[in-house]
């Protein structure tokens, strides 16, 4: 069976650019078919109301909606629209979504909340396209190297298996540092500690960016705050790199590629084949 997955992207978090790619990293997985629908950088209710219905034309077995802050007006509208459809749906969001998990339960929606996928320092006096890209690259590195993205991959793969078996169980997952590094499979305890530190640092970026973006007046006051937040993101990425380098030195980097049947393989030794 080929499982059809509809992905709706509205706005952007660090996980967004690679979400569909995590499920088919070499574009040769035979048991899934994915379509992505998006509203670009904007996530207002009017964009959401336009893009969410487009998933119906693909007739997916389940769909995923990913955006910042699942409680914001646009994503809240998306949740409302998805809860009314006869399609199992999963919401992927950042830390503010944790406060909406009871609502998502009531709406019959699954969720994956990536706690350390932080908001960006979105002030015109600071953020240009180059800075935006650098920030997202740093956060993506943290999420990949600490294991958070592998946990997203594994969780959605579980839903795919359920869909193929005719029994979808929607996830209810809050990705903490501990859960992320468990998925990463670190063998060296120092590498694991560095990865935990990197994940928690990335989570703290959001607090500083929120202070700079919403709680501080005067560009001379908020620019240092959002700049500091982005420096924290860069440092978190460097720390995550250090964790992976330790595992490389031990030849113990866990790799979990999708196999030719679509199932997940596993290997650690570099010069070996996944099983």
From Swiss-Prot:
GO terms for molecular function: ferredoxin hydrogenase activity; methylenetetrahydromethanopterin dehydrogenase activity. InterPro entries: MTD (IPR002844), MTD_sf (IPR036080). Pathway: One-carbon metabolism; methanogenesis from CO(2); 5,10-methylene-5,6,7,8-tetrahydromethanopterin from 5,10-methenyl-5,6,7,8-tetrahydromethanopterin (coenzyme F420 route): step 1/1. Keywords: Methanogenesis, One-carbon metabolism, Oxidoreductase. It comes from the Archaea. Its EC number is 1.5.98.1. This is F420-dependent methylenetetrahydromethanopterin dehydrogenase. It comes from Methanobrevibacter smithii (strain ATCC 35061 / DSM 861 / OCM 144 / PS).
